[in-house]
Amino acid sequence: GTEADVLYYFWVKQAQCPECANYVDLFSTRIFAKHAYPKRHPTARALCPGCGEVNETRYDEKQLRCTSCDLEFDPQTGPANGQKACCPSCEHVFPIAKTIRERGKPPNHRLYAKLMLLADGKKAYARTTEADRAKFEEAVRLLADRDSPYPVVAIEPGYNTNQALGYNYRYWHEMFNERQLLSLSILADRIRQISDPVLRDLFTCLFSGALEFNNLFTSYKGEGTGAVRHMFAHHILKPERVPLEANVWGTQKSSGSFMTMFEGRIRRALDYADNPFELRR
């Protein structure tokens, strides 16, 4: 197969049905990717509820036939509807937040799609494969082998944290998946090794920005704008039902990555310090 950089992985939260114990994907719509200005750029991507294939469609399409399994479905709907969800297996309707809270631990997530940057510079959406899942499991193992890779700090109750606590997020590191924790811990280690204290502080500030865009509370804004909606976009820590996993280090076409923030924040700030435009004559 062709090798490509993955810009973003797409995940969905799951709740366990209280009636039949099957895990329910908390999609409110099967359309998971569309342009930031869909009326001008109507092409979107929808996930087949039958086989999991990624289908190209319009953002407002209401009847779609899967190109892989021929299943007809309405891409505008999903198991989740407001604060409740309907189990596709047994049709039991249950409250989402209460069901997750009673489980006593943060909800499960399922990896279902990815956006790749191909060698020719084009982007392509695709369903995830066993190889993708194996790579994630490898990250889980590598994280387990690291010595104290992240701080364990409790989340205190408050206006901005109560929603997260309601979903059983008790510690800050639980807001990240294992691959994010692995990547961020490696990056933090390298920053700590910088001998110049000024440069070390500079990159520590940049690392703080990377945390905002690389966690399970981010979501996909779509193409045509900065693709990653960071964790503080809602001014509270809102658990995202369809979180986005970005490429922590990044590529030239990434959003919210360490590399692109270096170019967009640090390099621009240094250029401005050398040549502040208000003082030009």
Q: Positions of the model-derived regions?
A:
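Nucleic-acid modification enzymes, centered on SAM-dependent nucleic-acid methyltransferases
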Residues: 1-281
